[in-house]
């Protein structure tokens, strides 16, 4: 009977769904509800991690330190966690977060670039933080290649390494193969995590498959609040885990209430599988491109699906949000020539 560490990402990945505009009252209410529901950890910060607030990624309503301080102040059970992308967030940012009460950090890189995480993982360990490696866009690397990247993060000091399906593009077999490869390649004491998106409507199924293959840490969010069609809906996953007899420690009804009463009313765009978010999973595109691509579509009169599919064809990855407008302009020029 598996025991699972459930990490909620409503207040970090969920930032993408509302353009990083959570108010302090909202995050405090959500964090308090999650804490009372006994989730193991709550991640807080700009959707693109510490110092992600920028023209390229989206300006946050508040600074990370304000969000973190507000959440850390109300937690009694859950760990306060955050995300850092090397090249965006710095060791200085990490130290500031730790001083405010962050106890755990995920250091995220593209699935072929684990080497850029070395400095930040080592710094996190020096701060006595729990630290996980976060291999994003996992569908763009083979299971064997991903396992080698995970071993690098393990060598730098990561306590856990995640298979991160940022595009929501993996099928269940794809998740199974990658989690199995990591579990076989890493030391027994190094944990494996699973983070998926719901773009192909496989958010819960893929999380379940991940656990079946040895993942211990599972990311999920209230009402699936996250980039694209969202993440694994935490209340649905908890219900499925209960049906399977898994130990996750969360209060199912409390999660249901928080999802419906606190999170859904904040969505200015429904977090769901629709023609745009389905196109993200179909094309294998970074889920947080959604709102940027919709803006470009509205500005230039190009079908957002065409933009997303072309981004996938060009193999654009997180950090290349500036290319979305370029793609829209190229498609517009092609239409005008036709």
Curated annotation (Swiss-Prot):
It catalyses: (S)-4-hydroxy-2-oxopentanoate = acetaldehyde + pyruvate. The record marks 12 as: Transition state stabilizer. It is an enzyme of class 4 (lyase). Substrate binds at residues 12-13, 166, 195, 286. Its EC number is 4.1.3.39. Residues 4-256 form the Pyruvate carboxyltransferase domain. The keyword Metal-binding applies. It comes from the Bacteria. Pfam families: DmpG_comm (PF07836), HMGL-like (PF00682). One of its GO terms (molecular function) is 4-hydroxy-2-oxovalerate aldolase activity. InterPro entries: 2-IPM_HCS-like, 4OH_2_O-val_aldolase, Aldolase_TIM, DmpG_comm, DRE_TIM_HOA, PYR_CT. Keywords: Aromatic hydrocarbons catabolism, Lyase, Manganese, Metal-binding. HAMAP family: HOA (MF_01656). Belongs to the 4-hydroxy-2-oxovalerate aldolase family. This is 4-hydroxy-2-oxovalerate aldolase. It comes from Rhizobium rhizogenes (strain K84 / ATCC BAA-868). The lineage of its organism: Bacteria, Pseudomonadati, Pseudomonadota, Alphaproteobacteria, Hyphomicrobiales.
């Amino acid at each position: 009977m598996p025991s699972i560490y459930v990490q909620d990402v409503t207040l970090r990945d969920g930032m993408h769904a509302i353009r990083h505009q959570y108010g302090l009252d909202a995050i405090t209410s959500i964090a308090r509800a999650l804490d009372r529901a006994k989730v193991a950890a709550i991640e807080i910060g700009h959707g693109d991690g510490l110092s992600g607030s920028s023209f390229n990624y989206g300006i946050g309503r508040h600074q990370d330190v304000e969000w973190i301080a507000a959440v850390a102040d109300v937690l009694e059970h859950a760990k306060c966690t955050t995300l850092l992308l090397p090249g965006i967030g710095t060791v200085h940012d990490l130290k500031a977060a730790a001083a405010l009460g962050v106890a755990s950090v995920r250091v995220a890189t593209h699935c072929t670039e684990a080497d850029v995480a070395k400095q930040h993982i080592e710094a996190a360990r020096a701060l006595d933080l729990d630290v996980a490696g976060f291999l994003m866009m996992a569908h763009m690397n083979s299971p064997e290649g991903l396992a080698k990247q995970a071993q690098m993060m393990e060598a730098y000091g990561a306590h856990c390494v995640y298979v991160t399906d940022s595009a929501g593009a993996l099928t269940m077999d794809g998740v199974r193969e990658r989690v199995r490869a990591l579990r076989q390649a890493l030391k027994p004491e190094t944990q494996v995590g699973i983070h998926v998106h719901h773009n192909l409507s496989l958010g819960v199924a893929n999380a379940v498959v991940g656990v079946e293959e040895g993942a211990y840490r599972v990311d999920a969010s209230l009402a699936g609040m996250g980039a694209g069609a969202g993440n694994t809906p935490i209340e649905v996953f908890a219900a499925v885990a209960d049906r399977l007899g898994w130990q996750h420690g969360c209060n199912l009804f409390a999660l249901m209430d928080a999802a419906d009463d606190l999170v859904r009313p904040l969505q200015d765009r429904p977090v769901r599988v629709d023609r745009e978010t389905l196109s993200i999973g179909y094309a294998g595109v970074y889920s947080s491109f959604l709102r940027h691509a919709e803006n470009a579509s509205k500005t230039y009169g190009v079908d957002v699906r065409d933009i997303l599919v072309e981004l996938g064809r060009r193999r654009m990855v997180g950090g290349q949000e500036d290319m979305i407008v370029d793609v829209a302009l190229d498609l517009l020029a092609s239409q005008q020539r036709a």
